[in-house]
């Protein structure tokens, strides 16, 4: 991958810790990483246990002045961001610079809806988790601990998927028309094609 290129990852169906570890390493190496669809990230273990863990984390606060921290993020993207932060030396200049190279998003807002999204096989649930094992969705966990935008994100995702379907249909139609056009003119241009092939201009 080119040095200045942005790596766009689709968080859906990836395990939280494994994905965070890989992302942390990449940002430390100097790559810019964007993680979309954070609400679709999975956590191993059943939902109830994960919720109890998060509720226990919500109780951790500074007794005399809770506004001083620790801060408890509710959005799935911020929960993932904090997980990555825990894997970085974020109190050093190097760690801070690495964290600035990471961008996390709920859903797939523009311009990332038009960009090619990658997956990380080493962090995929289907690869890493036995089919019988229980797992939880980060989006549901976030919603139950105070994230207010689950419905909004879901609606926007439905709209995006509909647009993508229309775009794909148009693309297929154009490809079909192009093939047909090529077939139609094949006989007319065959002699020119032969000349181009003999001169090595057409493979």
From Swiss-Prot:
Keywords, alphabetical: Acetylation, Citrullination, Cytoplasm, Phosphoprotein, Ribonucleoprotein, Ribosomal protein, Translation regulation
Protein name (Swiss-Prot/TrEMBL): Large ribosomal subunit protein uL13
GO terms for MF: mRNA binding; structural constituent of ribosome
Similarity remark: Belongs to the universal ribosomal protein uL13 family.
Subcellular location: Cytoplasm
Keyword Ribosomal protein carried by entry: yes
Subunit field text: Component of the 60S ribosome. Component of the GAIT complex. Interacts with EIF4G1.
The UniProt record lists the keyword Coiled coil: no
Positions where Phosphoserine occurs in the chain: 77
A Gene Ontology BP annotation from the UniProt entry: cellular response to cAMP
In-chain residues carrying the UniProt-annotated modification N-acetylalanine: 2
Gene3D superfamilies cross-referenced by the UniProt entry: 6.10.250.3250, Ribosomal protein L13 (3.90.1180.10)
Function: Associated with ribosomes but is not required for canonical ribosome function and has extra-ribosomal functions. Component of the GAIT (gamma interferon-activated inhibitor of translation) complex which mediates interferon-gamma-induced transcript-selective translation inhibition in inflammation processes. Upon interferon-gamma activation and subsequent phosphorylation dissociates from the ribosome and assembles into the GAIT complex which binds to stem loop-containing GAIT elements in the 3'-UTR of diverse inflammatory mRNAs (such as ceruplasmin) and suppresses their translation.
Cysteine pairings via disulfide bonds: none
Annotated positions of the N6-acetyllysine modification: 191
Cellular compartments per GO CC: cytoplasm; cytosolic large ribosomal subunit; cytosolic ribosome; GAIT complex; ribonucleoprotein complex; ribosome; synapse
Residues modified to Citrulline: 59, 140
Pfam families xref list: Ribosomal_L13
Posttranslational modification: Phosphorylation at Ser-77 upon interferon-gamma treatment in macrophages involves a DAPK1-DAPK3 kinase cascade and is causing release from the ribosome, association with the GAIT complex and subsequent involvement in transcript-selective translation inhibition. Citrullinated by PADI4.
Broad class of the protein's primary localization: cytoplasm
């Amino acid at each position: 991958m080119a040095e200045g290129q942005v790596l766009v990852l689709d968080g859906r169906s990836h395990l939280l810790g494994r994905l965070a570890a890989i992302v942390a390493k990449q940002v430390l190496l100097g790559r810019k990483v964007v993680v979309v669809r954070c609400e679709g990230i999975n956590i191993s273990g059943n939902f109830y246990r994960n919720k109890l863990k998060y509720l226990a984390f919500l109780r951790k606060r500074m007794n005399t002045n809770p506004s001083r921290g620790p801060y408890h993020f509710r959005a799935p993207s911020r929960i993932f961001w904090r997980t990555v932060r825990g894997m970085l030396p974020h109190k050093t200049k190097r760690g801070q610079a690495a964290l600035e190279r990471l961008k996390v998003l709920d859903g797939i807002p523009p311009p990332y809806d038009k960009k090619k999204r990658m997956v990380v096989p080493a962090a995929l649930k289907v690869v890493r988790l036995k089919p019988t094992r229980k797992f939880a969705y980060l989006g549901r966990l976030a919603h139950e601990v105070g994230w207010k935008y689950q419905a909004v994100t879901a609606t926007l995702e439905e709209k995006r998927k509909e647009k993508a379907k229309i775009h794909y249909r148009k693309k297929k139609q154009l490809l079909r028309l192009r093939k047909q056009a090529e077939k139609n003119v094949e006989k007319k241009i065959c002699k020119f094609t032969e000349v181009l092939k003999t001169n090595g201009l057409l493979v």
